[in-house]
Structures are given as C-alpha cells and as structure tokens.
C-alpha cells in the first residue's frame, strides 16, 4: 500500500510529463490550489469563533477582529483570499479560452463546476458578517430567486432573510469548499488523463518531467503572488470591501447603492440592466451555461459546417470580444443604475452572448511545427 502511494505520487507529482514550452500562464492552477488551501485553513479557524445568530453574528466578527490574538490577520487573509481566488480563476479561465477548452472538455467542465461552487460559496460567505451591505445584498438575491417556487422559503427558512437564513448559510459556507476540493481532484485527474496543453495548441513529443523543472516555475509564481497577498491582507492597499458592510444591519435604512463584491459585478450588471428579475436570472444562468457549451464545440461543428481561419497562434476574434465584453460588464456593475449605463450594459450583454455563440463555431486551425527547430 505504501509502495503504491509513493508510486502514485511519483507518477502524478514528479514524473508527470509536461510540454517543454509552457510558460507562466500555466501557473494559475497551482496558485489557485495554494490560495484555496489557505482559504480553507483560515475559514476553519474563523468558524471556530463565529456565532451564526442574528444577535451575535456582527459582534462575533468584531470580537475576532479586536480581541482575539491575530484574529484580524485571519479575517483579512480570508477576505483577501476570496478576491484572489476569483482573480486567479478569471485568469485561469482566460487562459483556457485561448488554449484548452477545445482539447480538454472534461477538465473544462469540471473546472466550471468548481467555479460555480466558488460563486455560491462566496455569496453566502458575504452574508455572514451581517453588515448593512451583507443584509441588503442577501435580500436582493433571495428576492431574485423568488421566481422559483418554494426555493426562497427552503433557503431562508421563511419569507425574508432572518436567523434561520444565516444559520443555513453558515453550514453551506463551511461544507461547500470541501465539496469543491473533491471536484478539484477530479479536475486534476482529467487533466493528467489527457495531458497539459501548450502555447502552440497541439500535442508535442517534447516533454519534460514536472519535478523539478516546472515546479520551480510554479514556486516562482507563488513567491510573487504571496507577496501581493500578504501586502493586501496586512496593509489593505486596495479597498476590496464596501464601507457600509462595517455598519451593523439596519432593516429600515437602505444603502445608497447595493453593490456586491467586485468579482460578482459582471453578473450583477446583467441583473441590474434587465428590467425583469426572472429574465435577469435567466441571463445570468445562460452566461454560465455558455461557458459549459464551449466544451461541446467539436460536437456542434459536425452540425454547423462553418469554418474560419484566424492565425497560427489561434487568438480567436470572438473569444477576444467575449472577454472584453465580460470586463466591460464588470465596470458597468459598479456604476449607478443610470440610463447611459443601463444602455451600455444591454449592449455588452448582447455582445457577450453573440461573441460566445460565435466562438462555438469551429474554425480551421493552422499550425506550424516548431519542434524540428529544437535541438533535443
């Protein structure tokens, strides 16, 4: 048994063959794993001192920040880690849109399931501090889900956000990261089953073992991201949270603008610019489903027989517009709901879906074999 375990570790962590020409864009998965582990570790420590009750939730957070030894450090590391997880996830998806989704459909789908779990976990975690923005954000989202029969009552324990809501959210926020961790192992299994991609976009025989060659590249990236992580956690260089969330809940006073965390802003822009809440919910779900459909591109192209040629390095024009429209929605999500921003939001939603659907059309790939130039 011990021999098999050692052999498994050597096969998948040391001798795993990787393409010779991969670069820092392939670091994001490793960095995500490290930051996600830090999130679980700090979350377990915070959960041991948190009280999931309306009367004590806000004060338990203040107790952790002000009275526990290094409690403020764990609290801000957990908050910064959430932003960093989504930042790295978006970069990881960005790299996958250019290099991986067509070749590794199983890894792509499992990764998107992890992304969906991250979204749910982060949202319910945003409610737990029980600040002013947490309460009203939870109220808006749960009202949005009222179009689904009985879901709000089951999720909130009543018709409004109340004490049963925060208890259920706390349990889900504690359990879902471990569910995501299990799917991470499945994601790695599918990746190792087919092998990693590379910037040239096709399989090559020029491969080297993961250890020590590419591990040193991952460690270098980890050192850089760790410095940024600690600086942000300790000094708070970039204000990531809304100041209204430092105010205790007042159910009779609405904030000037209900704004979620920055990593939810693209989806919030879709909800804000669509007048019907049910239509907005459908648009948000469809935006995630569109990413899942990209894994079916090979099957769809057997039906749509329409091909295009872009370039040797395969920077697809629809994918570029797809990404630009997503980041434009991120900017629109933090703006006040004025007419001009609502108009821009609707235009970028149309561009987002049209470019994403256009990317589903397979294009002919033109590659140049550079392996003959390598003296190996």
UniProtKB/Swiss-Prot annotation:
One of its GO terms (biological process) is mitochondrial electron transport, ubiquinol to cytochrome c. The keyword 4Fe-4S does not apply. GO terms for cellular component: mitochondrial inner membrane. Pfam families: Cytochrom_B_C, Cytochrome_B. Its main location: mitochondrion. A ubiquinone binds at residue 192. It comes from the Eukaryota. Keywords: Electron transport, Heme, Iron, Membrane, Metal-binding, Mitochondrion, Mitochondrion inner membrane, Respiratory chain, Transmembrane, Transmembrane helix, Transport, Ubiquinone. The chain crosses the membrane at residues 28-48, 72-94, 107-127, 169-189, 214-234, 274-294, 317-337, 340-360. Coiled coil: none annotated. SUPFAM superfamilies: a domain/subunit of cytochrome bc1 complex (Ubiquinol-cytochrome c reductase), Transmembrane di-heme cytochromes. One of its GO terms (molecular function) is ubiquinol-cytochrome-c reductase activity. Its cofactor is heme b. Heme b b562 binds at residues 78, 173. Heme b b566 binds at residues 92, 187. It is a multi-pass membrane protein. Disulfide bonds: none annotated. The main subunits of complex b-c1 are: cytochrome b, cytochrome c1 and the Rieske protein. Component of the ubiquinol-cytochrome c reductase complex (complex III or cytochrome b-c1 complex) that is part of the mitochondrial respiratory chain. The b-c1 complex mediates electron transfer from ubiquinol to cytochrome c. Contributes to the generation of a proton gradient across the mitochondrial membrane that is then used for ATP synthesis. Belongs to the cytochrome b family. Heme 1 (or BL or b562) is low-potential and absorbs at about 562 nm, and heme 2 (or BH or b566) is high-potential and absorbs at about 566 nm. This is Cytochrome b.
């Amino acid at each position: 048994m011990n021999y098999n375990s050692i052999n498994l570790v050597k096969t998948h962590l040391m001798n795993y063959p990787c393409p010779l020409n991969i670069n820092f864009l392939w670091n994001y998965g490793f960095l995500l794993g490290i930051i996600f582990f830090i999130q679980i570790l700090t979350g377990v420590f915070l959960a041991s001192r948190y009280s999931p009750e309306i009367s004590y939730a806000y004060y338990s957070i203040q107790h952790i920040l002000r009275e526990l030894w290094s409690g403020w450090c764990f609290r801000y590391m957990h908050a910064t880690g959430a932003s960093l997880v989504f930042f790295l996830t978006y970069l990881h998806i960005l790299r996958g849109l250019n290099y991986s989704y067509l070749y590794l459909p199983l890894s792509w789908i499992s990764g998107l399931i992890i992304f969906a779990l991250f979204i749910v976990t982060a949202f319910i975690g945003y409610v737990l501090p029980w600040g002013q923005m947490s309460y009203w954000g939870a109220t808006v989202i749960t009202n949005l889900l009222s179009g689904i029969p009985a879901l709000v009552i089951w999720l909130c324990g009543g018709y409004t956000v109340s004490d049963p809501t925060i208890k259920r959210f706390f349990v889900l926020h504690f359990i879902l990261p471990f569910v995501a961790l299990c799917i991470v192992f499945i994601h790695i299994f599918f990746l190792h089953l087919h092998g990693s991609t590379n910037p040239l976009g096709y399989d090559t025989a020029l491969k080297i073992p993961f250890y020590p060659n590419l591990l040193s590249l991952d460690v270098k990236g980890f050192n850089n991201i760790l410095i940024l992580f600690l600086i942000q956690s300790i000094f708070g260089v970039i204000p990531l949270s809304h100041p209204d969330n430092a105010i205790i809940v007042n159910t009779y006073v609405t904030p000037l603008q209900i704004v979620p965390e920055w990593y939810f802003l693209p989806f919030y822009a879709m909800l804000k610019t669509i007048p019907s809440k049910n239509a907005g919910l459908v648009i948000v779900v469809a935006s995630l489903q569109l990413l899942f459909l990209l894994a079916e591109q090979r099957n769809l192209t057997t039906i749509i027989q329409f091909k295009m040629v872009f370039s040797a390095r395969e920077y697809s024009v629809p994918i570029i517009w797809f990404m630009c429209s997503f980041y434009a929605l991120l900017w629109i999500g933090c703006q006040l709901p004025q007419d001009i921003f609502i108009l821009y939001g609707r235009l970028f939603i149309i561009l987002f879906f049209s470019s994403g659907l256009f990317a589903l059309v397979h294009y002919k790939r033109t590659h140049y074999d550079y392996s003959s130039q390598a003296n190996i």
